[in-house]
Design a protein with these regions (language model features):
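Glycine-rich phosphate-binding loops of nucleotide-dependent enzymes
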Residues: 1-176
Length: 176
C-alpha cells in the first residue's frame, strides 16, 4: 500500500470538513473521491498535499508515518497535485512552467533547446498537446490545465491528486 490515511479529522470552527476519513491506495490504483459541494473532498486532498493540517489522524506513505508541513514535504514523498486553481507563472512559457525547479541547464544557464525537447516528448507520451513556446497568459484555460497536468507528470510523482480536473474544460477537451 503506497498511501494510507487513517481517521483524518479536520474542522473549521464548528464546521466539520472531514470526520474520521480513511483512504487506502495501492500502487497502480485510481481512486475517485465523489461527493456534494462542501463535503470535504478538497480538504482531504489539501491535507495530503500539505496545504492544510489535519486536527487528528495519521498519514502513511509506503508504511512510513508522515507529517506534511507544506507542499514541498509532500512532493519530496512523491505526491503531486493538479490544483483546481492553476499555479502557473503567467509571464513564462509553457516549457518554463513545466520544468520549473527541475530544468535542464547548460552550465549555469537554462538549456532552452533541451527543455523544449523534453516538454515535446512528455506532451507526446501523454497525448496532451501543448506548444512549449507559448506564453501561459496567452493560452486558453483548457491548455493551461494541460500545462498543470504535464507539470505534475514531469515531477515523476507516485501519487497524483486531481482537484476538480475537468472543471474548466469544455466537453471536447474532457473527451480528449
Amino acid at each position: 500500500m503506497i498511501l494510507e490515511m487513517k481517521n483524518i479529522v479536520k474542522t473549521y470552527g464548528n464546521v466539520v470538513a472531514n470526520n474520521k476519513v480513511n483512504i487506502n491506495l495501492n500502487k497502480g490504483e485510481i481512486l475517485a473521491v465523489v461527493g456534494e459541494n462542501g463535503a470535504g473532498k478538497s480538504t482531504i486532498m489539501k491535507i495530503l498535499y500539505g496545504l492544510e493540517k489535519p486536527d487528528s489522524g495519521e498519514i502513511f506513505i509506503n508504511g512510513k508515518k508522515m507529517n506534511f508541513h507544506n507542499p514541498s514535504d509532500s512532493m519530496a514523498q512523491g505526491i503531486g497535485m493538479v490544483q483546481q486553481h492553476f499555479m502557473l507563472f503567467e509571464s513564462m512559457t509553457v516549457a518554463e512552467n513545466i520544468v520549473y525547479k527541475n530544468e535542464m541547464k547548460k552550465g549555469v544557464f537554462f538549456d532552452y533547446k533541451k527543455n523544449i525537447q523534453m516538454v515535446e516528448e512528455l506532451s507526446k507520451r501523454y497525448m496532451l498537446k501543448v506548444d512549449p513556446n507559448a506564453i501561459v497568459e496567452e493560452c486558453p484555460v483548457g491548455l493551461q490545465q494541460r500545462v498543470e497536468i504535464l507539470k505534475t507528470l514531469y515531477q515523476n510523482a507516485d501519487i497524483i491528486i486531481f482537484d476538480e480536473p475537468s472543471a474548466v474544460l469544455t466537453p471536447i477537451e474532457v473527451d480528449e
